[in-house]
Every structure is written in C-alpha cells, then in structure tokens.
C-alpha cells in the first residue's frame, strides 16, 4: 500500500523523507526475497522430494504386492483388500498432489503479485530519484542566486559607504567655504566702514582746506589793504609779508599731499573691495554648485541604502541621514 508523504515547506526535509521511504522500500524487497521466497521454495522442494519418495515407495509396494500376488496363493479377499488399500493410498496421493498443485499456483500468483509490486516500487524509485535530482538542481540554482544577491548586496554596501564618505567630505568642504564666505563678508563690511570713514575724513579735510583758503584770502585782503594804506612802513611790512607768504603757501601744499595720500588709499581699498566682491561671487557660485551636486547625490544615496535594506529579512523603511 502506497503511503502519502507529509507536506514539507523545506526542500531538505522533503529530500530526507523521500530518501528514507526509498530505503524502506529497498529493505522491504530484500526481506521479502530473503525470507519468504527462499524459505518457501526450500519447503516446497522438500515436500516435493518427500512426495516423490512416497510415490516411489508406493509404486515399489504395488510392484511387490503384484509380485506377491503372482507368486503367492492368497485368497481373493486378501487381494481385494490389498488393492483397496492401494487405491486408497493412490487417492490420498492424488489429493496431496492436488493440494500441492493448488499451493504452487497460489505461490506463483503471490510471486507474480510481488513481482508487480516490485516493478511498481522500482518505478517509484526512479521517479523519486528524478524528483531528488530536480530538487537538487533547484537548490543549487537558489544557492547560486543567493550568492549573487549577497555579492551584489556587498557591492551596494561598499558603494553606500563610499557615497557617505563623499557626503561627509562635501559637507566639510561646504562648511569650510561657508566659514570663509562669512570671514570675507566681515572683511567686506569692515572695508566698507573704512571707506565710509575715509570719505568722511576726506570731506572733513576738504572742508577744513576751504576754510583755510578762505581765511588766507581774508588775511591776504587785509594785508593788501594795510599795505596800500601804509606805504611808508613798507620795508618792515614787506619783510613780514615775505616771511608769512611761504607759510601761507606751504599749508595748502601740505593739505594737497594729504588729499593725494587719502585718494591713493581710497583707490587701494576700492580695488580690495572689488577683489573681495569678485571672490565672494566665485565662492557663492561654488557653494551653489556644491549644493546642487549634493541635492543630486542624496537621492542616489537614499536609493542605494533602501536597496541594501531590501536584501535583508523584512527591512524597515529607513532614510539615510
């Protein structure tokens, strides 16, 4: 009777079950061949030999009795009795032969049934071997696919680590550039304040120069008026005027020198301001490029991290920081 195997979720357990069933069938066949057929055949051979010996013995007795009948002078009653006994023995022998024939037929039918069962078991064994081979090939394919998935997961993990390192480096560079931009903005503000102070100083010096020119003109007018009013005291006044005139002309020259220095400093500061603004624009452009690049790289990093988690057992939805 064919046994139905249990339902297994694991292929290895199913293989073990099929192998155990196959071994059990082989063992059953071996036991049947070793115990039943061999012993029964020996028994039948022995019984057949015994029956032949009995038949030969009865034949010898019959021959002996026939000889006795020819040579002896027995009565007809004794002869009939002997014949009746012989007939009874022959009937018994025929019954034994019929029973033996029936047994042999039954044994032949049983052997035929066992042979059919053996053929079925061998066919089932072939199917089981074929099924085991298919399962083994499927297991090898699954193992190869699993190995490839693990290798791909390792590559993705390494790529994820590399991208994280790049992001850390880019963030550090961006932070450093922001610090430099802040310093540059502070320097620009400081330069603007210095320019404003210089403009104020220039206006103040210009105002003081105009006042000084006005005061000198007033003094010159007063001096000319007093000169024409007092021509007689010309010698002393002339000497005094000659002494004061260089001093009056020297002061405007000193003011012009100061104004030229201030103008040069203003030009230098303007150049520094223009250079700082140009550098600020370049760094702002660099910062924008880094921000755009970071915005482009972050979705790729998120996708790689999610793909790495999907290769694990039931991953949770997690975003990289």
From Swiss-Prot:
Q: Which UniProt keywords are present, listed alphabetically?
A: Coiled coil, Sporulation
Record keyword Coiled coil present: yes
One Gene Ontology biological process: sporulation resulting in formation of a cellular spore
- Gene that produces this protein: cse15
- Which residues, by range, are in coiled-coil regions? 37-70, 108-205
> Species name for this entry?
Bacillus subtilis (strain 168)
Q: Give me the disulphide-bonded residues.
A: none
Q: Does the keyword Ligase apply?
A: no
Q: Where is the composition biased (Basic and acidic residues)?
A: 234-243, 282-293
**What are the start and end residues of every segment in region (Disordered)?**
234-253, 274-293
Q: What induces it?
A: Transcription starts around hour 2 of sporulation and requires sigma-E.
Top-level division of the source organism's lineage: Bacteria
- Name-wise, this protein is Sporulation protein cse15
Signal peptide range in chain numbering: none
